[in-house]
Design a protein with these regions (language model features):
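Nucleotide and nucleotide-moiety/phosphate-recognizing core
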Residues: 66-172, 180-205
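YjeF_N-associated NAD(P)HX repair module
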Residues: 2-34, 163-270
Length: 270
């Protein structure tokens, strides 16, 4: 006997729709890197075309760096030193500091522009860090000689994974080789390098400070990173010249944007 139709079950399945007539074609990127100017255009397009504001991109960027830092740190007892600038790179750094602190890490933020009156998103992210009670100190007070070294470093590694992790969020794509790092920042990057030599692991946000995002040329006191977390696509300067030497392992994160975002958003760019 034929079973009566169930009036509550749709005639066409909404759980298993019919396959599309056209076969699926995987999206492929055309662009392999971004210049400084293309990165700025991409940030603008994300807001105007996809309605994804810079705050969301910044949050995703900070989360990406946080995930790398957790792998490098090895344990929550590993000290994390976050160097923050005054631009969007610094905003990413403040997000990262907040997320790491919320996950139980001991975080110190080193302000590379003490006394500067922050505005916009960077101010917002910085205030969130202050509200949590995270220590913010002038970067000139960072003392790399106090980091673990020698036998003591070996002991620390057994207990906490690494002696410490340094996050470089001082300057991003805005640095141009034609304008050398000011002496104030050179002093800070020199301290970071001393810490690196003493066993600290260094993560650069988007591009190491002192590396030109377009040419790969680098300041004499540019930061040397073990890993660089770059966003959307690698910056052109990471793939050539000294930029390739200083960037370490390059990790690319889409920060919440479609995989072909750069191609579609910048299709009118030269």
């Amino acid at each position: 006997m034929k079973q009566p139709d169930n009036p509550f079950w749709p005639k066409k399945s909404i759980l298993f729709p019919a396959p599309p007539k056209e076969p699926y074609v995987p999206v492929r990127r055309v662009r392999q890197s971004l210049t400084r100017e293309e990165q700025r255009a991409a940030d603008k397009a994300a807001d105007e075309k996809y309605r994804i504001p810079l705050m969301i991109l910044m949050e995703h960027a900070g989360l990406a760096v946080t995930e790398i830092c957790e792998v490098m740190a090895g344990a929550r007892t590993t000290p994390i030193h976050v160097f923050a600038g005054k631009g969007n790179n610094g905003g990413d750094a403040y997000v990262c500091a907040r997320l790491l602190y919320s996950r139980g890490y001991y975080v110190t933020v080193w302000d590379c522009f003490p006394g500067y009156k922050h505005t916009g998103l960077v101010k917002t992210m910085r205030e969130a860090v202050i509200a949590l009670g995270i220590h913010i100190r002038p970067a000139e007070e960072f003392e790399p000689q106090k980091l673990s070294s020698g036998i003591s470093r070996m002991i620390d590694e057994r207990v906490s994974g690494m002696p410490c992790v340094i996050i470089d969020g001082i300057l991003g794509t805005g640095f141009e080789y034609a304008r050398p790092l000011p002496s104030q920042l050179r002093s800070i990057t020199a301290r970071i390098e001393q810490g690196h030599l003493r066993g600290a692991r260094v993560i650069a946000i988007d591009i190491p400070t002192g590396v030109d995002a377009n040419t790969g040329e680098a300041d004499l006191q540019a930061v040397a990173a073990d890993c660089t977390a770059t966003f959307i696509l690698p910056k052109a300067g990471l793939l050539k010249g000294r930029g390739r030497e200083l960037s370490g392992q390059i990790r690319v994160f889409p920060i919440g944007l479609p995989i072909d975002f750069a191609d579609t958003a910048l299709q009118s760019a030269p």
